[in-house]
């Protein structure tokens, strides 16, 4: 089987939506019956985004095999059925790390190690490896054409197109076509200069995606085609839309998938986008709305919680309600009190690290528990719920996590000291271990209690969810907390770790150590988020009586 590659680049400015465009195109090709995957090549020096600040980089998306990756991989999984893995995302740092390791081993037999050919060859090898077994692979190059950091990646894909043959390679370039109100027209010059920059490094784009706040007129697309040496039918207008799930239909309506299939000589049926049409219909025709408060520490950049926000919206789709998300800084709860949590239909505390704002999260969990407000805690959101219950119900004064107070009297949350590494070997860790790549990561099995709420929601006794954490419930103190009324609703496959807790005498109080947001999609939703939004809707109706 021959694999075809579409290399996706961006020009003029960053944040044009390369990831959404690539994912939308992949969704159309998948709807035509093709086996599609998407890769993201990031030009930063970090080995992976695992230790990067969420305020700088946004969320870290965790794959089933435990890779800490760019948030764009979350978009990919929400648009196509193919699951991402560590093969789908790599960085400059990862490439250099691998090349330097080989150099130290003597693999290069004393040769002078250079960007060309050693770095570019390493990039090409990873791209080809990631594409194995697929009909079409979309490869998104992070950054903007012209950035010095992107040059090795651009050179590598230029070479790769020659290696595999131009009949199996396409270059798709996203570019900004701004509208100037003073002139009353869109301007094509930035696009022309962006293509000129690409040409200077040996890449002639085959497709141009023109990003604008409005549809780019046919005459302007013809002008772009003429000056950029691209067929007119390959100049695609991608205007701003009120829902990202409309983009597959927008691209298909302009024949982008037909053009690509003809170029690759792929004989496949027309795309059936009925599932996406259903998503768009549900989104546009809600029967009501709810307001959910999300209490976190990185709220100045909503992308830090991208998958959680999307999963809440998916939960809304399954309940035919619009979910309004109120982002609340947990430090504001500390300084202004729980009064700022009034008038919420439900409360969610997402994952996070570090002590800043933790007491605000603990106060939030208490407020939700004592006032019968639906509560969903994720990762740290479960740990603060446990700490709150231990302090205020189980009589364990000043209970805490050893992450925040190492020598606390009641360490109800503590570091797991023994882990399985990628090869399955036992590895001992401590507070002094490296932060990067030293967490419990990826898909793990969880056994659900028969009498639990989550057992009803999932409809299965065993589930698999993705994790990203170092700290867990301390089993040494668990019996005392359970005796006070807390229910352990889910345990790890080996029965050693607490994965889900519930407060039984509460309308809806669920907290999990894993990250359910990573497996939620607009077409399928997720049982926890669907149940949570339903509980929010029911709470709103009770309050209205």
Swiss-Prot record:
GO terms classed as biological process: 'de novo' CTP biosynthetic process; pyrimidine nucleobase biosynthetic process
Keyword check for Nucleotide-binding: yes
Pfam families listed in its UniProt record: CTP_synth_N, GATase
Active site (record annotation): 379, 515, 517
Gene3D superfamilies, A to Z: 3.40.50.880, P-loop containing nucleotide triphosphate hydrolases (3.40.50.300)
Annotated binding of Mg(2+), by residue: 72, 140
Top enzyme class: ligase
Catalytic activity: UTP + L-glutamine + ATP + H2O = CTP + L-glutamate + ADP + phosphate + 2 H(+); L-glutamine + H2O = L-glutamate + NH4(+); UTP + NH4(+) + ATP = CTP + ADP + phosphate + 2 H(+)
Protein name: CTP synthase
Annotated UTP binding sites: 14, 187-192, 223
Organism: Salmonella agona (strain SL483)
A single MF term (Gene Ontology): ATP binding
Ligand binding (L-glutamine): 352, 380-383, 403, 470
Activity regulation details: Allosterically activated by GTP, when glutamine is the substrate; GTP has no effect on the reaction when ammonia is the substrate. The allosteric effector GTP functions by stabilizing the protein conformation that binds the tetrahedral intermediate(s) formed during glutamine hydrolysis. Inhibited by the product CTP, via allosteric rather than competitive inhibition.
Superkingdom per UniProt: Bacteria
Residues the entry annotates as binding CTP: 14, 147-149, 187-192, 223
Protein family per UniProt: Belongs to the CTP synthase family.
UniProt keyword list: ATP-binding, Glutamine amidotransferase, Ligase, Magnesium, Metal-binding, Nucleotide-binding, Pyrimidine biosynthesis
Residue positions binding ATP: 15-20, 72, 239-241
